[in-house]
Swiss-Prot record:
<dbReference type="InterPro" id="IPR036615">
    <property type="entry name" value="Mur_ligase_C_dom_sf"/>
</dbReference>
<dbReference type="InterPro" id="IPR004101">
    <property type="entry name" value="Mur_ligase_C"/>
</dbReference>
<dbReference type="GO" id="GO:0008360">
    <property type="term" value="P:regulation of cell shape"/>
</dbReference>
<comment type="pathway">
    <text>Cell wall biogenesis; peptidoglycan biosynthesis.</text>
</comment>
<comment type="similarity">
    <text>Belongs to the MurCDEF family.</text>
</comment>
<keyword id="KW-0067">ATP-binding</keyword>
<comment type="function">
    <text>Cell wall formation. Catalyzes the addition of glutamate to the nucleotide precursor UDP-N-acetylmuramoyl-L-alanine (UMA).</text>
</comment>
<keyword id="KW-0131">Cell cycle</keyword>
<keyword id="KW-0963">Cytoplasm</keyword>
<keyword id="KW-0133">Cell shape</keyword>
<keyword id="KW-0961">Cell wall biogenesis/degradation</keyword>
<dbReference type="InterPro" id="IPR005762">
    <property type="entry name" value="MurD"/>
</dbReference>
<dbReference type="InterPro" id="IPR036565">
    <property type="entry name" value="Mur-like_cat_sf"/>
</dbReference>
<dbReference type="Pfam" id="PF02875">
    <property type="entry name" value="Mur_ligase_C"/>
</dbReference>
<dbReference type="GO" id="GO:0008764">
    <property type="term" value="F:UDP-N-acetylmuramoylalanine-D-glutamate ligase activity"/>
</dbReference>
<dbReference type="GO" id="GO:0005524">
    <property type="term" value="F:ATP binding"/>
</dbReference>
<keyword id="KW-0132">Cell division</keyword>
């Protein structure tokens, strides 16, 4: 646990008692603060009360002037589309609003660090797609290389649940736009921006607000090293803003769309080969084509970002390649779940938006595509530019018929996962790939994308076993 600093003897309100909220309450108590907790869910309140925390109905009693700070969980809106009433009341009263990420950055360093020869480092990863894979890959590479490393944030443990830093250790954080937007302190040693595509726009007031939330990771004091994907205009702009000149190697530019040139530090992948150039000279290369845990160009982008971050931490190209080759991949992200009768079955349930689905569609051949769900802002028309390898779409979700009508490829309205899997498997031939890449949210039929992916895998396995 990371005891929170700066609030000893003070009251701190905690709104939301899920994984991060309850961990925050514990860390506040460990730092000498009194956590005043609230969640609309009675079971969550009961769990907190069972650990001895004070329950205060912040909806009715508000955030009083005896409160030093309000800590908000990521799912609670603090500005758009409208601030939660408790947050609005705190802002009106002048009470600072923060989250567990801000508390982590103000509390992670300890007095014992004065005796370390090699200080602990923090790598923070943000972006629209690829955050989890990039974060997990960095963690895996470092672990395989023998570095003490912890994985936290949106993946792994709650950020305040991790152990204090030890000499030479690394913490890898996956951070969403909700987290970077609100955190009052953001000071990673290495910051990674994977890419940007429309997502969560209602929570940020539009695309500009969404980019601004991501960009804060690079603006709050600035990291020692910035790894920035430059395949979108926002990333290219951010890299330019961070750089002091063409040869400034504080910024490592990353691309999978083109060969990068110039005197700076670049990592790019072309035709399945990763290349690193620094000061105009090649410094490393990896053949990514046969790395099973990283299929497709989108995973090559993740590989480039992870490679750059690990190089910034001092690892050799050889050590990084060894880690990549043993990387098993993450569930629900281009996850090969079965191969039978010459047909490959892939679970990419995490492809919850158009951009992520397009990247999955570009990674495989002869695709029987299971898609559909709750469409996100911006629609799905852009999918039609990436359907060259799609033999047929099998559409699920409550809006399956409307979804199918927008696709310029042969489609069948299946509605449910069991029907879609049954139809795709019945029609699949050797050499085909049955791919779940929904391009939509899951909440019309499932609690989350994980449950959707698990349903797909269960339906596939049931039929293979039968």
């Amino acid at each position: 646990m990371i005891p929170v600093k700066g609030f000893a003897g003070a009251n701190v309100a905690v709104l939301g008692l899920g994984r991060s909220g309850l961990a925050t309450a514990r860390a506040l108590r460990a730092g000498g603060a009194e956590a005043l907790c609230w969640d609309d869910n009675p079971a969550a309140r009961e769990a907190a009360e069972g650990e001895g925390f004070t329950i205060r109905d912040l909806r009715k009693q508000g955030v009083r002037d005896d409160t030093a700070c309000l800590i908000v969980s990521p799912g609670i809106p603090h500005l758009y589309p409208a601030p939660n009433p408790v947050v609005a009341a705190a802002l009106e009263a002048g009470v600072p609003v923060d989250n567990d990420i801000g508390l982590f950055f103000r509390s992670f360093a300890g007095p014992e660090w004065d005796g370390f020869d090699t200080l602990p480092r923090v790598v923070a990863v943000t972006g629209s797609n690829g955050k989890s894979t990039t974060s997990a890959l960095i963690h895996h590479i470092l672990s395989e290389a023998g570095r003490p490393v912890q994985l936290a944030g949106n993946i792994g443990r709650g950020v305040l649940d991790i152990e204090p830093g030890e000499e030479g250790s690394v913490v890898v954080l996956e951070l969403s736009s909700y987290q970077t937007d609100l955190a009052r302190a953001l000071t990673p040693d290495v910051a990674v921006f994977t890419n940007l595509s429309p997502d969560h726009l209602d929570r940020h007031g539009g695309m500009g607000g969404y980019f601004a939330a991501k960009r804060r990771l690079f603006a709050e004091g600035g990291p020692d090293r910035a790894v920035i994907g430059v395949d979108e205009s926002e990333g290219l702009y951010l890299a330019g803003q961070m750089s002091e000149g063409p040869g400034d190697d504080r910024v490592i530019r990353v691309s999978v769309s083109r060969k990068l040139t110039g005197p700076g530090w670049q990592v790019f992948a072309r035709k399945g080969y990763l290349s690193e150039y620094r000061k105009g000279r090649q410094a490393g290369s990896i053949d990514l084509r046969d790395i099973r845990g990283l299929p497709g160009a989108h995973n090559h982008q993740n590989a480039c970002a992870a490679y750059a971050a690990c190089r910034a931490l001092g690892l050799s190209p050889k050590a990084i390649e060894a880690g990549m080759r043993s990387y098993p991949g993450l569930p629900h992200r281009s996850q090969i779940v079965a191969e039978a009768g010459g047909v490959t079955y892939v679970n990419d349930s995490k492809a919850t938006n158009v951009d992520a689905a397009l990247k999955a569609l570009g990674a495989f051949k002869r695709i029987r595509w299971i898609c559909g769900g709750l469409q996100k802002e911006g629609g799905i028309a852009a999918l039609n530019g990436g359907l060259a390898e799609v033999l047929k779409a099998y559409v699920i979700g409550r809006e399956a018929a409307g979804f199918a009508l927008q696709l310029e490829v042969e489609s069948e309205v299946c509605t449910t996962m069991d029907e879609a899997v049954a139809r795709a498997m019945a029609e699949a031939e050797p050499g085909d790939t049955v791919l779940l890449a929904p391009a939509a949210a899951s909440f019309d039929q499932y609690d989350n994308f994980e449950r959707r992916g698990e349903d797909f895998m269960a339906e596939v396995q049931k039929r293979l076993d039968g």
